[in-house]
Amino acid sequence: IWLTALKFLGKHAAKHLAKQQLSKL
């Protein structure tokens, strides 16, 4: 359960960071 939760959070964080990087560019 923890692994799947971490994977989900990781994907969510990656998307959020990607959006921030795109907005900066």
Curated annotation (Swiss-Prot):
Q: Which domain of life is it from?
A: Eukaryota
Please list the GO biological process terms of this entry. Answer: defense response to bacterium; killing of cells of another organism; monoatomic ion transport
Q: In which tissues is it expressed?
A: Expressed by the venom gland.
Keyword check for Thylakoid: no
Q: What is its main location?
A: secreted
Where located?
Secreted; Target cell membrane
**GO CC annotation:** extracellular region; membrane; other organism cell membrane
Key word Ion transport present in the record? yes
UniProt keyword annotations, A-Z: Amidation, Antibiotic, Antimicrobial, Cytolysis, Hemolysis, Ion transport, Membrane, Neurotoxin, Secreted, Target cell membrane, Target membrane, Toxin, Transmembrane, Transport
For this UniProt entry, the molecular function terms from Gene Ontology, in alphabetical order, are:
toxin activity
Positions carrying Leucine amide: L25
What family is it from? Belongs to the cationic peptide 04 (cupiennin) family. 05 subfamily.
Q: Other comments?
A: Mutated toxins are expressed as transgene in yeasts. Yeasts containing transgenes cause lethality when feed to lepidopteran larvae (S.frugiperda).
Query: What function does this protein fulfil?
Result: Forms pore that permeabilize the cell membrane. Promotes efflux of calcium from synaptosomes, causes hemolysis, and dissipates voltage gradients across muscle membrane. Potently inhibits the growth of bacteria, yeast and Leishmania. Is lethal to lepidopteran larvae. May function both in the prey capture strategy as well as protection from infectious organisms arising from prey ingestion.
Q: Protein name, please? A: M-lycotoxin-Hc1a
Q: Which species does this protein come from? A: Hogna carolinensis
